[in-house]
Amino acid sequence: MSIITAYNEAWDNGDVDALAKIIHDDCIFNPHVGGITMSKSDILGFAGGEGTPQSEHQRILFENDEVGVAHSIVHFANDSDSEAVMAFMRFKDGKIILMETGATPLSDDYQLVGQ
């Protein structure tokens, strides 16, 4: 099973133990929001609870032993706009050591820059 598929299944099932096995101890997650970065413990604390974001239409665009790129639609428990999320992951020792995301809000009034 691919690392991204295993991650998505663990996240969707709220399986924090499985996520802990997939995420490298030195993992850094940069969501490019508010200048924050998150560690493995931050990610695990965010997963499996009532406020965990839910994903759909998950697609793996590219994955090999070193990196992966995925896309999904993410819905948040705080009623904020859903987002189309692109994720880049770097792997080390078969685990996610780096994850960065970029997102586009999917609100009805969203307009492409320059339109």
Task: Describe each PLM feature range.
Residues 38-39, 98:
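A sequence-level detector of short linear motifs
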Residues 28-37:
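A short gly/proline-enriched turn/hairpin at secondary-structure junctions
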Residues 30, 44-115:
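A beta-strand edge to alpha-helix "cap/lid" segment located at domain peripheries
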Residues 12, 40, 54-55:
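Structural motif corresponding to alpha-helix initiation and N-cap regions
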Residues 5-9:
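Amphipathic alpha-helical repeat scaffolds
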Residues 13-28:
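Short, well-ordered alpha-helical segments enriched in acidic and aromatic residues
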